[in-house]
Amino acid sequence: MDLSRSAAWSALVSHRQEVEQLHMRDMFMSDHDRFKHFSIRWNGLLLDYSKNRINSRTMGLLVELARQANLIEARDGMFAGEKINFTENRAVLHTALRRQPGYTLNVDGLDVPAEVDSVLRQMKAFTDKVVGGEWKGYTGKRITDVVNIGIGGSDLGPCMVTEALRPFADGAIAVHFVSNIDGTHVSEVLKRVDAETTLFVIASKTFTTQETLTNSMTAREWFLSRAIDPAHIALHFAAVSTNRTKVVEFGIDPENMFRFWDWVGGRYSLWSAIGLSIALYLGFEAFQELLRGARAMDEHFQEAPLEENIPVILALLGVWYNNFFDVPSHAVIPYDQYLHRLPAYLQQLDMESNGKRVDRLGNTVEYPTGPIIWGEPGTNSQHAFFQLLHQGTGFIPADFILPLKTQNPIGEHHDILVANCFAQTEALMRGKSASEASEELAAAGVDEETMQMLVAHKVFPGNRPTNTLLLDEINPFTLGSLIAMYEHKVFVQGVIWQVNSFDQWGVELGKQLAKAILPELQSQKESDAHDASTNALINSYRSYREGQKVG
């Protein structure tokens, strides 16, 4: 069924026309309990969604849309191990990685909880040895640096988490990440580490990913130029992979290969052995606490009524703006410097999941799907793109994320940060009218002629929606909950848009073409196999390598 032709969708189209002229400033003035009506408190987290262009009827219609999309059945099917990733014939069970032990679940004859428990125990034993100093390098020194080599979900998740939880690391081990095929990335990391005390974690499910394998071979060559003996590789390299043969060929001891499964997608994999670098940096107990936080959000998502369900509410608000206001963009603004990698992580989670143009039946969709996700930490973002948020021609919904406790209580820093966060959401909601701008200019002693010239530039339309997420603090548990919340938000939107949120065919074409172009770059023959633009670019590169400048 095309949900855009459903009764709920039609009702929302009509309702949008009803609320179009309503201003949130007036909604707050007419309802002093608006915050109470549109906020949820849960387990150390507060979601305030009262600063949205909604009323109780809006939310009722959006929840009905979710019901007509069979959201509850889809959610239950995912947790039960149904193969909802139908284009790859796979279950979607990242949630099983953090479930409480003692449940029963089989997928293709595999005992899922037993498999997960086995890998967690392997991770704990390995982590305890490395962190405790029992694991020694080839000269007998303990490990002081871990270099994670991966890309996409094998990089973005662990990198974001280790940055977010840096205050919880004891400093015994530093962690570094290499992802980009640009040789600068691996070169700069290798400058900062010592072969005698560095452990490389190669994160690649197939152990064939071009970027990861190229970077890994460079790291291997760098290591052997110092350690000499290939037998030493086993002391300094571990793998997160399913390809035992390739891992052994590389020189890695299979005892130090950590497996995961095809029912764990890359962008949902930080909870698996892909999170090994997290455990090595923070300790295994912190990694388990991250899992517990995610599990708590899983249970909330499964058990809370749709009307009080945090991921569902966030997803429905996104659908409201994306599909009924034609707003294809959503900003994420963490007011915490440790969360500076969260927007990049959410870009992949959301855009790779729901950036789809065909529905589950293979039909081209007739409505917008995944939005553009972007953002920067506050207050940096205020001095970069908030001009557009406040006075641009359209509006962009935004999530403001703020921990109430700072890990670095210095002077008034945190109070100023908090004041800015709250002020921005109020300003985006309220705006400033022409009369208010005129009064402000008059109070500043501006003459009438100048005032008439300036007033239009001083007007803020307001009525620009935001969600505010307050957390007691960012710690492993709350971060786990926050990440799982966004995972489930993306899932809900995928169900409503009727797309497969768990494949990513869109990354394949460019990779295929790159394989064809690579030998052409290294050939002596001028390229003529492509369109005029691509041929010219290839030949420009070849000419440059032969000594000719581009321009």
Curated annotation (Swiss-Prot):
<dbReference type="GO" id="GO:0006094">
    <property type="term" value="P:gluconeogenesis"/>
</dbReference>
<dbReference type="GO" id="GO:0048029">
    <property type="term" value="F:monosaccharide binding"/>
</dbReference>
<protein>
    <recommendedName>
        <fullName>Glucose-6-phosphate isomerase</fullName>
        <ecNumber>5.3.1.9</ecNumber>
    </recommendedName>
</protein>
<comment type="pathway">
    <text>Carbohydrate degradation; glycolysis; D-glyceraldehyde 3-phosphate and glycerone phosphate from D-glucose: step 2/4.</text>
</comment>
<keyword id="KW-0312">Gluconeogenesis</keyword>
<dbReference type="GO" id="GO:0097367">
    <property type="term" value="F:carbohydrate derivative binding"/>
</dbReference>
<keyword id="KW-0963">Cytoplasm</keyword>
<dbReference type="InterPro" id="IPR018189">
    <property type="entry name" value="Phosphoglucose_isomerase_CS"/>
</dbReference>
<dbReference type="InterPro" id="IPR046348">
    <property type="entry name" value="SIS_dom_sf"/>
</dbReference>
<keyword id="KW-0413">Isomerase</keyword>
<dbReference type="InterPro" id="IPR001672">
    <property type="entry name" value="G6P_Isomerase"/>
</dbReference>
<comment type="function">
    <text>Catalyzes the reversible isomerization of glucose-6-phosphate to fructose-6-phosphate.</text>
</comment>
<keyword id="KW-0324">Glycolysis</keyword>
<dbReference type="GO" id="GO:0006096">
    <property type="term" value="P:glycolytic process"/>
</dbReference>
<dbReference type="InterPro" id="IPR023096">
    <property type="entry name" value="G6P_Isomerase_C"/>
</dbReference>
<dbReference type="InterPro" id="IPR035482">
    <property type="entry name" value="SIS_PGI_2"/>
</dbReference>
<comment type="similarity">
    <text>Belongs to the GPI family.</text>
</comment>
<dbReference type="GO" id="GO:0005829">
    <property type="term" value="C:cytosol"/>
</dbReference>
<dbReference type="GO" id="GO:0004347">
    <property type="term" value="F:glucose-6-phosphate isomerase activity"/>
</dbReference>
<feature type="active site">
    <location>
        <position position="511"/>
    </location>
</feature>
<dbReference type="Pfam" id="PF00342">
    <property type="entry name" value="PGI"/>
</dbReference>
<dbReference type="GO" id="GO:0051156">
    <property type="term" value="P:glucose 6-phosphate metabolic process"/>
</dbReference>
<feature type="active site" description="Proton donor">
    <location>
        <position position="352"/>
    </location>
</feature>
<comment type="pathway">
    <text>Carbohydrate biosynthesis; gluconeogenesis.</text>
</comment>
<dbReference type="InterPro" id="IPR035476">
    <property type="entry name" value="SIS_PGI_1"/>
</dbReference>
<feature type="active site">
    <location>
        <position position="383"/>
    </location>
</feature>
